[in-house]
A protein has these predicted regions:
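Phosphate-binding loop of NTP-binding sites
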Residues: 86-157
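N-terminal leader/targeting and accessory segments in enzymes
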Residues: 1-89, 93
Length: 157
């Protein structure tokens, strides 16, 4: 497995300064690096052409299964072992470590997580955002995310 700094150095050697990273082709913005790896429900490598069409300047992909890079695709690319595990740390670095300036509370359990998070956010003296089943944002002004827990690349953006 490469380190985040090694990945960034490889991108820089190719002349690529990443504006951001995305592991969902629908969220790729021009200048992003697309991270393509097998997921729980879908294989992100199937969406590489879509990510490039949306402006991805490079693709980092994980080998395995019957996947092979299509040489007709013109984006800079390289294979990375353990890419999914590196997605969060890579996003953290590319976006300037945004979570380091936050106080975080995690709520776990079988039932009541949404209720508890809303109670905490409402009772907190300062601005307090929540992420969960109902969406992400501030109490009363939540944006639907479609996910209970967004991927790290989405959270860091």
């Amino acid at each position: 497995m490469s380190s985040v700094l090694e990945l960034l150095a490889r991108l820089k050697a190719l002349g690529i300064q990443s504006a951001g990273v995305a592991d969902d082709s629908r969220q790729v913005q021009p200048g992003d690096v697309f991270l393509a790896y097998p997921g729980d429900l879908a294989d992100g490598r199937r969406y590489i052409p879509d990510a490039i069409a949306r402006g991805a300047v490079a693709v980092l992909w994980q080998a395995g299964g019957d996947f092979a890079w299509n040489p007709a695709l013109t984006a800079a690319n390289f294979q990375v072992d353990g890419l999914r595990a590196l997605a969060g740390p890579l996003a953290h670095t590319v976006y300037g470590a945004p979570s380091e300036g936050l106080s975080l509370i995690a709520i776990t359990g079988t039932n009541g997580k949404t209720t508890v998070s809303q109670f905490i956010a409402s009772a907190h003296a300062g601005r307090c955002a929540v992420i969960g089943t109902l969406g992400a944002g501030f109490p009363g002004v939540l944006e639907e995310t479609g996910f209970t827990t967004p991927e790290a690349t989405t959270l860091m953006r």
